[in-house]
Amino acid sequence: SPILEDADLSCLLSASVGADTLPRTVKERFEDVVRRRGGSVQLVEGYGLTEAVTGIMTTPADSYREGSVGIPCPDMEAKIVAPGTQDTVPVGEEGELCLSGPAVMLGYLEAPEETAQTLQRHADGKIWLHTGDIFSMSEEGFFYFKLRLKRMIKSSGMNVYPAQVEAVLYRH
């Protein structure tokens, strides 16, 4: 970008992104631009949503795992359930991300039905926010965003993740 041509980026202390899946090529390109302008930060991924005061997960320093949005922030709990249920899926399997903790909203203003669908009391007695986002979790507890349920494409009876299509496009 012409705006950054003469910029001194040595002042950057951190840089993070959490909008959607971050392709490795974009991460590397960003870090290269920062390095050429005197900076040394790594671009780390995180995850958040409005219903949970935005930032809920982040990648700890020097713990980069390609495709991961990190681990839950302190005082937050996360688990993966089979979509439409409260049943936890095995580690490594995909399912809907649920969150519990002090950052989770109390409900939607004047929308009790939507609140009841989104905030559910599970068998452990805690209120869990059903995010509508599909994730998987590694053995080490790192979470991997797959897609927003509302963005899933159905093609010939198969579920296709937009990120799969985007990954192919990024290679070309």
Q: Language-model segments: which ranges?
A:
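Gly/Ser/Thr-rich phosphate-binding loop
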Residues: 2-68, 77
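Structured loop/turn residues at beta-strand edges in well-structured enzyme cores
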Residues: 7-10, 92, 129
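Short Gly/Pro-enriched turn/cap motifs at secondary-structure boundaries
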Residues: 67-72, 88, 118, 125-127
